[in-house]
Amino acid sequence: MARTRIAGITVGQAPRTDMTADLESRLAPTLELVQYGALDDLTASEVERDLAPKPGDEVLVSRMRDGSQVTFSGTKVLPLVQERIDQAEREGARAIIVLCTGSFPELRHEVPLVYPQPLFHAAARALAGGRR
């Protein structure tokens, strides 16, 4: 029986086992997590050259496959995130989880797309019990 594919998309490079090992260990046997990274096709030098933040840009930080850290423009990486969403859908993903806690504008998608940030905010509000 084929497993249902769920895509995990990071703004850095995949795989991000530091972020997904716990999640994968809790998935039902009928589910498969396939990871995609917005920066998968780029080297650190290309990220620095092509995605460098300009004054006023939101600055994102992520990891490359080799464990090194890169900083880049949130605006400039969005088209690459969209490309990975499109790829995941073409490859049969039934749902997509964005593996980044930053805020994102609405991205185009055909399957359910989960953004962690609103979930974290809701959990924090619930835990705070109305306190600030």
Question: Model-predicted segments: where are they?
Answer:
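Solvent-exposed alpha-helices and their adjacent loops that cap or buttress functional pockets
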Residues: 1-2, 106, 125-128
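N-terminal glycine-rich anion-binding loop in soluble enzyme alpha/beta folds
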Residues: 2-72
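Short glycine-rich or small-residue beta-strand-to-loop segments that form or flank ligand, phosphate
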Residues: 5-9, 97, 132
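Short, glycine/charged-enriched secondary-structure capping and boundary segments
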Residues: 21-24, 110-113, 128
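Generic secondary-structure signature for well-ordered alpha-helical cores
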Residues: 24-29, 86-90, 129
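Short, well-ordered secondary-structure micro-motifs
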Residues: 46-47, 108-109, 126
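N-terminal glycine-rich phosphate/adenylate-binding segment common to multiple enzyme folds
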Residues: 71-118
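Hydrophobic alpha-helical segments within soluble ligand-binding/sensing domains
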Residues: 114-131
